[in-house]
C-alpha cells in the first residue's frame, strides 16, 4: 500500500516530502487512507514594535505538544524564517524557545535545506534573462526585482546597462518576492511553471512583456525542484512539524505553502497554521487571500497570542487586542485569547483573567510557555478541544475577484483595521499608480480587479495613527504594484520597507 513514506526522503537532519506527488496520488486514489484534519489559525496582537515577537511560534509548538499529550493527533505548519533577518539581529529565530522548541533550531533558522537560496537564485536568473532581453530589444524596462536574503541599503536601487539607457532595477528581500508567493500559492510544479510564465518581466513600448514570451521555464522549475518540498522536523517533545515557505506577513502574504497545509490535513487530525505578525497581517491574508481566493481551508478555531505588556502597558494601544479577538469571533471562528507570560509575570494571572472576563472573551489560556512548554497548556484546553470537536462546519467565504481595487482596499481597512471607508485617504500619486497598474494589466490580458489584494504595511501599526481617537484614525493608500504571476496586487499603506534593515523591519 502506498503511504506518505513513499514520498519522503531523508535530507540531512530533517526529512523532505514530495507534497505535490502525495496530493496528486490522493486525488487520483480517492479511496486511499487519509485524514481530514481541521485547521487552527495561530495569530497575534499587533506588536508594539516590529522587532518584538509575541511568541506565536513558541505558542504553536507548546500547543501541538499539549494536544498530543491529550491524545489528539496534532501537527503544526510553520514558515521558514529569513536567515538574513535572524542574522542581522532584528528578531529572534522562528524555532520557538525553551521547552517549546524545535529540534535543530540552528538548522531551521540558518537556511534549512537551501529553499530560500533556491528561490533567490531562480528569481535572480529571471532578472538576468530580462537584462538579456533588454540587449536583444525585447524589453525597454525591467519590473521584476533582484532579491537578496541579506539586507543592504546600498542595493535599494541600481542601474544596469550603463551607457545603454541606464535601465533602473531594484533589489528586495527574498521573502518579499513574487516567486516566493508563487511557490506558496501553487499546488503543482505545472502551476508554478504557468504562474512564472505570467510574471510581468517588464515593458516594451509601454506594453507588458511576460517571462513566458522569452524564457525556457524548465530552467526555473529545475532550480526549484527541492525547494518546493516541505521539510519535516519535530519539537523537542517529539511532535511532528512541517516547515515550508517564508513570505513576510507585512510586505507579502505571510503564510506557509498551501500544499504543506493540505498535506498535513491529510495526515493529522488537527493542523496548527502560524500566520506572520498580527491578526491585521498574516491572519488577514490567510483568511482573505489563501481561503477567500485560493481555496484554502477556513479555520475551525483561532488563537490570538499576546504578551501581558503588549496588551495592557500602553493604554492608547490597548484597543487593538480586543479588536482582533472580536473580529475573528465575528467571522464565526471560535477564538481563544492566549497570554504568553514572561518571567516574573505569574502574579498577573488573576488580573489578566478578570480583564478577559470584562471584555467578554472566552476563558483565556495563560502560561509561561518558554519555561513550561505544553505542560502549561494541556490542562487549560478543554474549551478549545470542545470547540474543535463540536463546532460548526467552517465557512466557505465568497471571492472578491472582480471587486474594484479601491473598494477592496476600503473593505480591508474597515474589516481588518476598523477604519470606515470614508476615512481611507489617497496619497498624492496613488490614483496615477492605479491607472498605470490598470493599463499594465490590460496590456497583459488580465484585469487588475481580478488580482487578490495584498496590504503592504508596517507590522507595528494598523492605521496611520493607532494612538489617535477611534473617530480620527485613517488608512492612507500610497502606491500599487502588480504581481501578475502570483495573481496578486500590492497596495502600500502606512510605513513599509522591503529592502534595507532599519530599526523596524
From Swiss-Prot:
Which enzyme type, at the first EC level?
Answer: ligase
Q: Which UniProt keywords apply?
A: ATP-binding, Ligase, Nucleotide-binding, One-carbon metabolism
**Pathway annotation:** One-carbon metabolism; tetrahydrofolate interconversion
Q: Alphabetically, which GO biological process terms does the record hold?
A: tetrahydrofolate interconversion
Return the InterPro entries for the record: Formate_THF_ligase (IPR000559), Formate_THF_ligase_CS (IPR020628), P-loop_NTPase (IPR027417)
**Which PROSITE patterns does this chain map to?**
FTHFS_1
Domain of life per record: Bacteria
Q: E.C. number, please?
A: 6.3.4.3
- Please list the reactions this protein catalyses: (6S)-5,6,7,8-tetrahydrofolate + formate + ATP = (6R)-10-formyltetrahydrofolate + ADP + phosphate
One function term, GO molecular function aspect: ATP binding
Q: Where are the transmembrane segments?
A: none
Family statement drawn from the similarity comment of this UniProt entry: Belongs to the formate--tetrahydrofolate ligase family.
Q: What is this protein called?
A: Formate--tetrahydrofolate ligase
Q: Which organism is it from?
A: Bifidobacterium longum (strain NCC 2705)
Amino acid at each position: 500500500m502506498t503511504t506518505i513514506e513513499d514520498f519522503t526522503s531523508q535530507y540531512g537532519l530533517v526529512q523532505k516530502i514530495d507534497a505535490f506527488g502525495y496530493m496528486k496520488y490522493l486525488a487520483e486514489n480517492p479511496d486511499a487512507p487519509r485524514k481530514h484534519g481541521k485547521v487552527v489559525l495561530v495569530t497575534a496582537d499587533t506588536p508594539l514594535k516590529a522587532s518584538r515577537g509575541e511568541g506565536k511560534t513558541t505558542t504553536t509548538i507548546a500547543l501541538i505538544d499539549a494536544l498530543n499529550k491529550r491524545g489528539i493527533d496534532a501537527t503544526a505548519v510553520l514558515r521558514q524564517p529569513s536567515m538574513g533577518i535572524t542574522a542581522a539581529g532584528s528578531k529572534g529565530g522562528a524555532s520557538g524557545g525553551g521547552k517549546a522548541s524545535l529540534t535543530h533550531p540552528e538548522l531551521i533558522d540558518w537556511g534549512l535545506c537551501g529553499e530560500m537560496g533556491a528561490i533567490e537564485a531562480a528569481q535572480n536568473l529571471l532578472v538576468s534573462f530580462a537584462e538579456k532581453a533588454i540587449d536583444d530589444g525585447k524589453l525597454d524596462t525591467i519590473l521584476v526585482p533582484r532579491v537578496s536574503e541579506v539586507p543592504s541599503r546600498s542595493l535599494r536601487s541600481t542601474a544596469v546597462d550603463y551607457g545603454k539607457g541606464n535601465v533602473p532595477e531594484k533589489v528586495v528581500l527574498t521573502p518579499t518576492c513574487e516567486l516566493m508567493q508563487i511557490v506558496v500559492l501553487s499546488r503543482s510544479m505545472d502551476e508554478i511553471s504557468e504562474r512564472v510564465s505570467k510574471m510581468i518581466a517588464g515593458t516594451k513600448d509601454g506594453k507588458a512583456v511576460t517571462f513566458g514570451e522569452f524564457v525556457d521555464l524548465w530552467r526555473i522549475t529545475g532550480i526549484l525542484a527541492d525547494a518546493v518540498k516541505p521539510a519535516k522536523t519535530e519539537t523537542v517533545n517529539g511532535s511532528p512539524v512541517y516547515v515550508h515557505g517564508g513570505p513576510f506577513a507585512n510586505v507579502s502574504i505571510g503564510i506557509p505553502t498551501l500544499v504543506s497545509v493540505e498535506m498535513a490535513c491529510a495526515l493529522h487530525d488537527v493542523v496548527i497554521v502560524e500566520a506572520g505578525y498580527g491578526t491585521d497581517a498574516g491572519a488577514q491574508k490567510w483568511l482573505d487571500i489563501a481561503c477567500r481566493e485560493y481555496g484554502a481551508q477556513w479555520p475551525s478555531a483561532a488563537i490570538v497570542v499576546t504578551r501581558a505588556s503588549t496588551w495592557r502597558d500602553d493604554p492608547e494601544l490597548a484597543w487593538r487586542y480586543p479588536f482582533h479577538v472580536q473580529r475573528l469571533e465575528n467571522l464565526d471562528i471560535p477564538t481563544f485569547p492566549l497570554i504568553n507570560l514572561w518571567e516574573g509575570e505569574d502574579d498577573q494571572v488573576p488580573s489578566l483573567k478578570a480583564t478577559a472576563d470584562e471584555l467578554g472573551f472566552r476563558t483565556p489560556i495563560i502560561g509561561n510557555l518558554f519555561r513550561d512548554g505544553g505542560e502549561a497548556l494541556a490542562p487549560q484546553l478543554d474549551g478549545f478541544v470542545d470547540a474543535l470537536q463540536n463546532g460548526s462546519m467552517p465557512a466557505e467565504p465568497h471571492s472578491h475577484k472582480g471587486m474594484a481595487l479601491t473598494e477592496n482596499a476600503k473593505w480591508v481597512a474597515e474589516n481588518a483595521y476598523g477604519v470606515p471607508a470614508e476615512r481611507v485617504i489617497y496619497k498624492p500619486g496613488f490614483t496615477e499608480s492605479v491607472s498605470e497598474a490598470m493599463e499594465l494589466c490590460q496590456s497583459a490580458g488580465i484585469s487588475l480587479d481580478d488580482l487578490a489584494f495584498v496590504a503592504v504595511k508596517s507590522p507595528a501599526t494598523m492605521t496611520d495613527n493607532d494612538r489617535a481617537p477611534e473617530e480620527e484614525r485613517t488608512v492612507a493608500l500610497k502606491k500599487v504594484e502588480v504581481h501578475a504571476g502570483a495573481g496578486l496586487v500590492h497596495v502600500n499603506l502606512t510605513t513599509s520597507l522591503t529592502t534595507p534593515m532599519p530599526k523596524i523591519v
